[in-house]
Amino acid sequence: MKRLLQKIYHCSKVYGFTAAGAVAIVGIVIYERSRNNPVFSSWTTNHDPSVKWDYNWDKREPESVIKPPKETATDDEKLQYKEKLKKVPTATRHIILIRHGQYYDRESLDINRKLTDLGREQAQLTGARLVDMNYPWSKLICSTMTRAQETADIIHKQLPDLPREECDLLREGAPIPPEPPSGNWRPEKQFYKDGARIEAAFRKYFHRADPEQTNDSYEIVVCHANVIRYFVCRALQFPPEGWLRISLNHASITWLYIRPNGRVGLRTLGEAGFMPVNKVSVL
């Protein structure tokens, strides 16, 4: 502003502007600048999110699953289409992700990577926690890796009536190259192979309820840290490359829910507060 005033003063001397004329010019310049740089009373008055929520992230919006009528369709066919669009989900899906307990991670073969004594205690504590929560659990799903199966076995003994299934898609792996990069180098083909599988697992288990589902569901999924961290980023529509910045304790509980309209929320991330301090571990 000081330099601007100096220039105007110089011009007034050279071109013979009057003082009043110079003041008028200054006023016009200040006014134009204020229009280009408005000041708001709060950031919320004119806030545009950098990334907007994709409501059709699971491709289950009614318009995506119901075939539209042809241009030559009759009025009755068009009316039927509109009625089908009104049939939308009403239930919420709760997905409880549980990391396996501590295990012997220095073994090379999966069959030998069993739970340690501490890992078995952790799984027992998590099972007891699920019992105390007393939700109408729908089913128990687990990875086919040894440490996940052993964790699921211990939990299932405390919830014996719960239907159980296993899924190879939930096996541990490298979902996507992390950002910033990890100090542990991995060949690109590993991300290429594991990433597609873990993404397939996400698409299989993460979606809003079907319109036919009338009650909220509570599914328990026992799997692995990398898989869970990737799921959290994808479900919340955060950059998935950030998965490695999240840390999860062994046998911890991560709770995501999917509303009928496609909104997703995170209730807990890596909850292990139900364990005594000396039973908590991450590696």
What are these regions (language model features)?
Residues 1-17:
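N-terminal mitochondrial targeting presequence
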Residues 5, 18-167, 188-190:
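Active-site-proximal alpha-helix that buttresses catalytic centers in soluble enzyme cores
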Residues 94-95, 212-226:
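Generic beta-sheet signal
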Residues 101, 225, 272:
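Active-site metal-binding loops of divalent metal-dependent hydrolases
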Residues 171-187:
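Short alpha-helix plus adjacent loop in nuclease-associated cores
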Residues 186-216:
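Internal catalytic-core helix/loop-beta-alpha segment
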Residues 239-265:
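Domain-level recognition of soluble alpha/beta enzyme cores
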Residues 268-283:
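Acidic, His/Gly-rich catalytic cores of divalent-metal-dependent hydrolytic chemistry
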